[in-house]
Amino acid sequence: MGKLMKYEWKKQRTSRMIVMVALAVCVLTFLGGVMVEKDALMGVSAMLLLVGSFFVVFYMGIESILILNRDLKTKQSYMIWMTPKSVWEILGAKFVVAIVQMFFVFALYVIAGLLCFVGMLQYVGELGNVFAIIRDSFIQLSGEGQLIAQIIWNLFCIFVGWTEVVMVGYLAVIVSRTILRDSKYAGGISIVAFFVITFIIEKIYNLISNVLPNVEVAGNSFFGVGYLVYYIIICVAVFLLSGWMADKKLSV
């Protein structure tokens, strides 16, 4: 499975390089604006980082889905399913690499954001006092350790939620491409399947939340324990269903 993961990791190498170069340019531009005291330069680079973060995280997530669609569509890419490896190994490698890819890009943006934040505090010294006051207020309300734990918890829940979205995308593609392999409408069917599956998952979540409201008690966090448990279960269920369908339709 390690070789399969390396193979899948290489498929998105170009995208990662573009993101890394773009981030480096934005951060250097921002820090350059700090050094020469150019507010416009700092503002433009910060805006590009902010807007780009939404696009990049979204694209890097769906790119793995597009690659899976290509692997099931073109004859050359379809050959990966004819290797001696089991469908479970191939699909597992794709899932793991997709998750690692998202985490990698997320980590890059966190590092870039921290560098810009430190540079901004150096440039506007008095602003540091404002952030210190805000931080102290949060600490007084929840305690320093709890504040850090809440931030980590919320970020992890967001990561799990986005992972579930990508996995549902995988399932939608597998459903369309295994049933309508040679159909020109398979792409459109996969989009419809994605929204239908997502709608069903969210409906079930809402029903559970109404029946068991206590599982959604989140304290000072945005996400409750029920949210995390539910979507982890969904991720596992979607993987098993995707693997079962692929094994039935693609194994040789």
Regions found by a protein language model. Name each.
Residues 1-76, 87-252:
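Hydrophobic alpha-helical transmembrane segments of membrane proteins
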